[in-house]
Amino acid sequence: MLSPRRTKFRKQQRGRMEGAATRGNTLTFGDYGLQALEPAWITARQIEAGRRAMTRYIRRGGKIWIRLFPDKPVTMRPAETRMGSGKGAPEFWVAVVKPGRIMYEIAGVSEEVAREAIRLAAYKMPIKTKFIMRETTEES
C-alpha cells in the first residue's frame, strides 16, 4: 500500500475540503481516466483495491497511472479510552480528493476495455465518479 517514506510532521489536522480541484484535474498521461465528482478522503487501501481491480481486468495490455497519493495521516485513539491525554497515534493514510480530481488513468487499451476497467475501480471508491476520455487532438 502507498504511504510516505518520511514526513516533516507525524500528525496533521483534519482540514476542510472546499471547492473543486485546481490541480490534477486534466488527463496528463493516459487516454482514459476516472474523475471524482464529490469530495472525500480516499484511503491507501481503497486506492490499492482500485488499482488491483483494473490491473486484473486489463492483464498484460495497457498501462495504468495512479494520480493520487495518500500523504495525510489519520490518527485514531484506542477503543474504550478516556478523553484527554493527547491526540491518538497515526493509523492509516489518506489522499484528500476534491471534485474534478483525476484518480486513475489508462492507456494502450481499447475504449471498451478501459471503460470496464475504470468501472471496476469506481466500484471500490466511496464517492461518485465519472469516466473521461481525452479529446481527439487536432492535427496541424
From Swiss-Prot:
Protein name: Large ribosomal subunit protein uL16
InterPro entries per record: Ribosomal_uL16, Ribosomal_uL16_bact-type, Ribosomal_uL16_CS, Ribosomal_uL16_dom, Ribosomal_uL16_sf
A single MF term (Gene Ontology): rRNA binding
Stretches for region Disordered: 1-22
Gene3D superfamilies listed in its UniProt record: Ribosomal protein L10e/L16 (3.90.1170.10)
Origin species: Cyanothece sp. (strain PCC 7425 / ATCC 29141)
CDD domains for this protein: Ribosomal_L16_L10e
BP GO annotations: translation
Matches recorded under Pfam families: Ribosomal_L16 (PF00252)
GO cellular component term, pick one: cytosolic large ribosomal subunit
Function statement: Binds 23S rRNA and is also seen to make contacts with the A and possibly P site tRNAs.
HAMAP family, per the entry: Ribosomal_uL16 (MF_01342)
Protein origin, superkingdom: Bacteria
Keywords per UniProt: Ribonucleoprotein, Ribosomal protein, RNA-binding, rRNA-binding, tRNA-binding
Biased composition (Basic residues): 1-14
Family: Belongs to the universal ribosomal protein uL16 family.
Subunit details: Part of the 50S ribosomal subunit.
